[in-house]
Amino acid sequence: GNTTTIPFAAQHHGQSLRDVVRDYHQRAAGKAVIDYAFHLIISDPTEQVLGQELPALIADGYISFKVYTTYDMLRLDDYQILEVLALARREGALVMVHAENHEVIRWLGERLLEGGYRAPKYHAVAHARLAESEAAHRIIALAELLDVPLLVVHVSTAEVADEIRRAQDRG
């Protein structure tokens, strides 16, 4: 059976990572009957977060975190992602990335809505293969620039799987 779970603890804009971890531990306190830890979701990489909070949390054992290139409340721009990747390299942490091109998805979604295409099946149309492959290629390039390991998550296209394989072959 399962003896450990590692869910995501999500930071929201303006929120301290220490507060996020404390809140998630409080949610589990007295309820968890198995071991648990947290992957952190970084959505507001301020100087305070990157300079103090995240290094301290990594030292405490929170060695993996996730960033997004899409979703209004979660996405980071390339500069912010570079800052997170640089910190991960320095501190020996692992960055996971949900890679999709936000603007492509937004543009396609708006066109679909304008055309009256509102059924749930059009969600997949708005999240086109190109949106994933472009963002994954860009994120892999940023990780290669800094020579830092990266885990691209939620891979749904052969193009991205091939891109990851090529990056692994390059080392």
Each language-model region and where it sits:
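Residues that form or flank phosphate/diphosphate-binding pockets in enzymes
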Residues: 15, 48, 75-76
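Short acidic, glycine/proline-enriched helix-loop-strand junctions
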Residues: 19, 34, 91-93
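Metal-associated gating/positioning segment near the N- to mid-region
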Residues: 1-31
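A glycine-rich helix N-cap at a beta->alpha junction
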Residues: 27-41
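Structural detector of well-ordered beta-strand residues that form the stable sheet scaffold
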Residues: 3-6, 37, 96, 151
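Active-site mouth loops of central-metabolism enzymes
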Residues: 9-12, 37-50, 69, 124-130
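Short N-terminal helix-initiation segments at or just after the protein's N-terminus
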Residues: 7-9, 33, 117-121
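Histidine/acidic residue-rich metal-binding segments in metalloenzymes
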Residues: 52-69, 73-171
